[in-house]
């Protein structure tokens, strides 16, 4: 029987670094999480996961089965380095190849959702041509994802092109495909001049997962929970009242901390307390 509890997960980069997924999932289970989100970022080490052998992929699947902790989503931020909007044809082709490999990887290991970074370009200057190429790249990517039955979900970003749900919804209407949805980050959403609650309500029906972190205007990473501008309780209440029942993912970058598990446990308790106040979970 499926649980009726709110699924709460932890980002891979919050946990100690390394390539042993059995250990990572065991730790996540000990910390009380339902799932872990995998990172495939722009570093060569994490990009190389897309070239894992059959045996390596099977080891991940076996770790999931053994622990009961799922890996249902991938944060694919590698497109910062290889953007779909690049005016360099070779770089853009590499970005599309990364997308193809990520979708194949997801299909092989049971990942359901690939979170996309909403950058047309990141290290270069954006213009109308980079945005056109980005749109075309998304269209090609969604066609690949449709065939694999893998959902691509756009993150609300630390970047003006995709800094609100309203803007991201423009892409859902443009692509008009059930395999392209939204994966908002309530931290990023709150750091801009957005009506956060209205934005969350506007996205209902397209939101497949939610990133949970704190932010300040212009500061999008490593803001301790409770020290930023995010009104977590109101965000959780809005999502609950709007009928959202999907997963929440605590996003942290504590993998190099002196005691990552302690940092994560502290954040988990803080977030769950706000969820309890919003009537989403029972108070601990």
From Swiss-Prot:
UniProt keyword annotation of Isomerase present: yes
GO molecular function: intramolecular oxidoreductase activity, interconverting aldoses and ketoses; L-ribulose-5-phosphate 3-epimerase activity
Keywords: Isomerase
Catalytic activity entry: L-ribulose 5-phosphate = L-xylulose 5-phosphate
Pathway entry: Cofactor degradation; L-ascorbate degradation; D-xylulose 5-phosphate from L-ascorbate: step 3/4
UniProt keyword Kinase, yes or no: no
Induction: Induced by L-ascorbate. Repressed by UlaR.
The protein's Enzyme Commission number: 5.1.3.22
SUPFAM superfamilies per the UniProt record, alphabetical: Xylose isomerase-like
Enzyme class: isomerase
GO BP: any one term: L-ascorbic acid catabolic process
Family from the record: Belongs to the L-ribulose-5-phosphate 3-epimerase family.
Function: Catalyzes the isomerization of L-xylulose-5-phosphate to L-ribulose-5-phosphate. Is involved in the anaerobic L-ascorbate utilization.
NCBIfam families membership: hxl6Piso_put, PRK13209.1, PRK13210.1
Protein name listed in UniProt: L-ribulose-5-phosphate 3-epimerase UlaE
Organism per entry: Escherichia coli O17:K52:H18 (strain UMN026 / ExPEC)
Gene that this sequence comes from: ulaE
């Amino acid at each position: 029987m499926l649980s009726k509890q709110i699924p709460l997960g932890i980002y891979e980069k919050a946990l100690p670094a390394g390539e042993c997924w059995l250990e990572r999932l065991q730790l996540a289970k000990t910390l009380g999480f339902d799932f872990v989100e995998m990172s495939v970022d722009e570093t060569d080490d994490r990009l190389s996961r897309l070239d894992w052998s059959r045996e390596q992929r099977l080891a991940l699947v076996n770790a999931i089965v053994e622990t009961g902790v799922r890996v249902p989503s991938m944060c694919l931020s590698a497109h910062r380095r290889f953007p779909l909007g690049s005016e360099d044809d070779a770089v853009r082709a590499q970005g599309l190849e990364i997308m193809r490999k990520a979708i194949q990887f997801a299909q092989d290991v049971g990942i359901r959702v690939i979170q996309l970074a909403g950058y047309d370009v990141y290290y270069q200057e954006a213009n109308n041509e980079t945005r056109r190429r980005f749109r075309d790249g998304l269209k090609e990517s969604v066609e690949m994802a449709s065939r694999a039955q893998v959902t691509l979900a756009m993150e609300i970003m630390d970047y003006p092109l995709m800094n609100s749900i309203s803007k991201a919804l423009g892409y859902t209407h443009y692509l008009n495909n059930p395999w392209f949805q939204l994966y908002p980050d309530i931290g990023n959403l709150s750091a801009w001049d957005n009506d956060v609650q209205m934005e969350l309500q506007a996205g209902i029906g397209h939101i497949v997962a939610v990133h949970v972190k704190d932010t300040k205007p212009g500061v999008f990473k490593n803001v301790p929970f409770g020290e930023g501008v995010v009104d977590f309780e109101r965000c959780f209440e809005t999502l609950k009242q709007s009928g959202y029942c999907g997963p929440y993912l605590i996003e942290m970058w504590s993998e190099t901390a002196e005691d990552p598990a302690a940092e994560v446990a502290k954040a988990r308790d803080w977030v769950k307390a706000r969820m309890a106040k919003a009537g989403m979970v029972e108070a601990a």
